[in-house]
């Protein structure tokens, strides 16, 4: 879209005034405010239905219309073009107003001047509307940018907390692994001790069983000896009784023989 302004002189020649972004105190190398403000929150693609490109175009369009209105106010020559397609709406030349004479002749007619003034007022109203829309969009953009900064701060806090939680989890995991290794070593040691005790118990049990068996055998042999000795005592007792009876009989016979 061309924003250059063309004026027609009295001799019929056309003078084209190129659009310069450094007019009205704006340096050429100055970047649009919207672009600078959009850098902290590049993730916001649309704002109130308008993209960043729409906002930038609206800003430059507003600036161009403002400059055009200023040139119309301070120039006798005028030309009104549409910003959308560059179509010439009206052009001509008007005389300056001096005290006492009003609008002089020679140049554009009153109808053309009135039409140009109406077009100027319409362009000014459109520029004011665009400027108001731009201000509203810029305020909304600042609100969104502040919200994005708040979200970014919350994200940073959450990330720091997540790092602390991850470090704490790693610490607890290291402690758990240490306790697990200690428990495994203690379990292995207890298992070895249990196996040793079980083997010792089996050996002791076998030894005790052998001793019991040997004692049982010895007891059985002792019982057999006791039985044999008991039988011998019984036999000796019978023999003693028989001998005593025989002694008594022989004593009785001796007494009888003596009496005779």
From Swiss-Prot:
Q: Which Pfam families match?
A: TACC_C
Q: What is the effect of changing residue 94 to W?
A: No obvious phenotype
Entries under InterPro entries matching the protein:
TACC_C
Cell cycle among the record's keywords?
A: yes
The positions making up the signal sequence are none
Q: List the disulfide bonds.
A: none
UniProt keyword terms in alphabetical order? Cell cycle, Cell division, Cell projection, Centromere, Chromosome, Coiled coil, Cytoplasm, Cytoskeleton, Kinetochore, Meiosis, Microtubule, Mitosis
Q: Report whether Ribosomal protein shows up as a keyword of the record.
A: no
Question: Which stretches does the entry tag as region Disordered?
Answer: 1-43
| GO CC term (a single one) | meiotic spindle
- Which regions form coiled coils? 108-249
Question: Which GO molecular function, any one, fits this protein according to its record?
Answer: protein domain specific binding
User: What does UniProt note about where in the body, tissue by tissue, this protein is expressed?
Assistant: Expressed in touch neurons.
**Compartment annotation:** Cytoplasm, Cytoskeleton, Spindle pole; Cytoplasm, Cytoskeleton, Microtubule organizing center, Centrosome; Cytoplasm; Chromosome, Centromere, Kinetochore
Which Gene Ontology terms describe the biological processes this protein takes part in?
astral microtubule organization; cell division; embryo development ending in birth or egg hatching; meiotic cell cycle; microtubule-based process; mitotic spindle elongation; mitotic spindle organization; negative regulation of microtubule depolymerization
Q: Null phenotype? A: Maternal-effect embryonic lethal. RNAi-mediated knockdown results in a meiotic defect in 30% of early embryos and defective microtubule related processes during the first cell cycle in early embryogenesis. In one-cell embryos, the maternal pronuclei fail to migrate and the breakdown of the pronuclear envelope is delayed.
Q: How does it assemble?
A: Interacts with zyg-9 to form a heterodimer. Interacts with zyg-8 to form a heterodimer. Interacts with efa-6 (via N-terminus).
Instruction: Give the protein family.
Output: Belongs to the TACC family.
Q: What does this protein do?
A: Involved in microtubule formation, polymerization and assembly, regulating microtubule nucleation and length. Plays a role in pronuclear migration and mitotic and meiotic spindle elongation during early embryogenesis. In complex with zyg-9, functions during the early stages of embryonic development to regulate microtubule assembly throughout the cell cycle. Specifically, the complex is required for the formation and growth of astral microtubules and spindle microtubules during mitotic spindle assembly.
Name of this protein? Transforming acid coiled-coil-containing protein 1
Query: Per the UniProt entry, what species is this protein from, by scientific name?
Result: Caenorhabditis elegans
* Underlying gene: tac-1
């Amino acid at each position: 879209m061309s924003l250059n302004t063309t004026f027609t002189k009295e001799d019929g020649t056309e003078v084209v005034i190129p659009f310069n972004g450094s007019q009205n105190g704006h340096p050429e190398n100055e970047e649009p405010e919207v672009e600078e403000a959009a850098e902290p929150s590049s993730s916001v693609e649309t704002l109130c239905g308008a993209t960043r490109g729409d906002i930038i175009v609206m800003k430059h369009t507003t600036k161009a219309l403002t400059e055009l209105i200023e040139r119309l106010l301070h120039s006798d020559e005028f030309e009104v073009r549409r910003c959308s397609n560059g179509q010439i709406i009206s052009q001509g030349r008007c005389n300056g107003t001096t005290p006492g004479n009003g609008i002089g002749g020679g140049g554009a007619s009153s109808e053309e001047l009135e039409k140009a003034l109406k077009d100027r007022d319409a362009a000014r109203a459109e520029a004011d509307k665009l400027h108001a829309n731009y201000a509203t969009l810029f305020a909304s953009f600042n609100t969104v940018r502040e919200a994005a900064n708040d979200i970014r701060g919350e994200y940073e806090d959450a990330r720091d907390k997540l790092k602390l939680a991850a470090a704490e989890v790693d610490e607890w995991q290291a402690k758990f692994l240490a306790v697990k290794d200690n428990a495994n070593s203690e379990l292995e040691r207890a298992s070895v001790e249990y196996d040793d005790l079980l083997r010792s118990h089996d050996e002791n049990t076998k030894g005790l069983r052998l001793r019991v068996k040997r004692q049982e055998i010895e007891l059985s042999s002792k019982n057999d000896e006791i039985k044999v000795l008991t039988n011998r005592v019984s036999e000796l007792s019978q023999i003693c009784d028989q001998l005593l009876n025989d002694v008594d009989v022989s004593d009785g016979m001796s007494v009888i023989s003596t009496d005779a």
